[in-house]
């Protein structure tokens, strides 16, 4: 039974999709069959894996509203052991439609259930909001990974996010847990960065990944080439950071790399 992890932050520009794409790719490279589920209407995880988000055909929108099973939407990527459930702009209207459907909080959970036996890890790239689609994701997953940028206002909205996770845990998904908090856009030369690190560790004791994701131009460039950074520039700082994050993530889950890229 594969583990499901939602990558969530209700604020854009924090490295959410970058983390979803590159962590999923790195885990696949280490020998584990991995699925990335793009449920962000912007579809940047979809394009970041080399697909045209304007021409995906069926998408996670169809899966969520019940027009097509997940198996029909599934796409193999050209990257090692990594598959994708793509998104497109149709998702932008899904919140309104889902609100009127039966079992509205469990649409994603029920849709992904047949795939959990086929994958070791399933990562969900959530919308940058705490709407009904994100609530659906939280109801469907085992854990939540929260990226936080090392910048001013880094903790903005975190209390609201944690409150939402607690409500979902109480009402719908009692087993959900915090997988970890990931510090992104890290620049150790800045005093502000050190202040943010201290604040985050105080807010999330024992939950902050030891690996940090640095500011890195290759991380910014890779999506425009439709590639995870490890395939775009294996030697870059960004690639090495996500490689190390995958190792730490696997260790937390009692796993070791089965192969090396």
Positions of PLM-derived features:
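P-loop NTP-binding core
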Residues: 1-261
